[in-house]
Curated annotation (Swiss-Prot):
Assembly, per entry: Part of the 50S ribosomal subunit.
N-terminal signal peptide: none
Pfam families with a match to the protein in the record: Ribosomal_L4
Biological process annotations from GO: translation
Function (record text): One of the primary rRNA binding proteins, this protein initially binds near the 5'-end of the 23S rRNA. It is important during the early stages of 50S assembly. It makes multiple contacts with different domains of the 23S rRNA in the assembled 50S subunit and ribosome. Forms part of the polypeptide exit tunnel.
Region described as Disordered: spans on this chain: 49-90
HAMAP family registered for this protein in UniProt: Ribosomal_uL4_B (MF_01328_B)
Protein name, per record: Large ribosomal subunit protein uL4
Homology family: Belongs to the universal ribosomal protein uL4 family.
InterPro entries reported for this sequence: Ribosomal_uL4, Ribosomal_uL4-like, Ribosomal_uL4_dom_sf
Domain of life: Bacteria
Length: 204
């Protein structure tokens, strides 16, 4: 498919041919959902922890004798039914991440790219460069009508990354970092010429 190449000044810089096998497939919502869940699971810290019966402080002595008191038998004051007792089946420190096949991850990324193209929210940029001043980049983004955009380049230029850092909902990623969650989490997906070539190599 042919796409018009735009500049950050909202000008035209020719056309680019985007491969249909990356930007023209039928989006798979189920695959994208699987990849997003996988990404979010990997991001979880997993530092949640409560103390169990064997970890809370307190005596290990039997509260009272087994029989003859008229009360229900008890073996420990650290049992979960007591106010100061341990938790039962509570959360423990663990890794929430799990494995997802590379082919599924690849198809998820291709589906996300194709969905943006199908929605008309894919923009091909000539280059993503800036002076480093946020105000200048903010004016250009406003002129383009972008309120939420992800800019993907082969490598994010240092000045451009610095200028975009303070803009809300405007993010820049290298092609190696392009992912389903961030693509779907932004309204516009802008990819530079170099970024397109990088995605071709990555998804070849």
């Amino acid at each position: 498919m042919d796409y018009e190449i735009k500049t950050l000044d909202n000008g035209s810089a020719g056309t680019a041919v985007l491969p249909d096998e990356i930007f023209g497939v039928t989006p798979r919502a189920d695959i994208m959902a699987r990849v997003v869940h996988w990404q979010l699971a990997k991001r979880r810290a997993g530092t949640h922890k409560v103390k169990g019966m064997g970890e809370v402080s307190g005596t290990t002595k039997k509260p009272y004798r087994q029989k003859g008191t008229g009360s229900a038998r008890q073996g420990s004051l650290r049992a979960p039914q007591y106010r100061t007792g341990g938790a039962v089946h509570g959360p423990v420190v663990r890794d929430h991440g799990y494995d997802l096949p590379k082919k599924v991850r690849r198809l998820g990324l291709i589906s996300a790219l194709s969905q943006k193209a199908a929605e008309g929210k894919l923009v091909v940029l000539d280059a993503a460069t800036a002076s480093g001043r946020t105000s200048e980049l903010a004016a250009k983004v406003k002129a383009l009508g972008w309120k939420s955009a992800l800019i993907v380049d082969a490598t994010v230029e240092e000045n451009f990354g610095r200028a975009a850092r303070n803009l809300p909902k405007i993010d820049a990623l290298p092609t190696i970092g392009a992912n389903v969650y961030d693509i779907l989490n932004h309204d516009v997906l802008a990819i530079t010429r170099a970024g397109v070539e990088g995605l071709k190599e990555r998804l070849a």
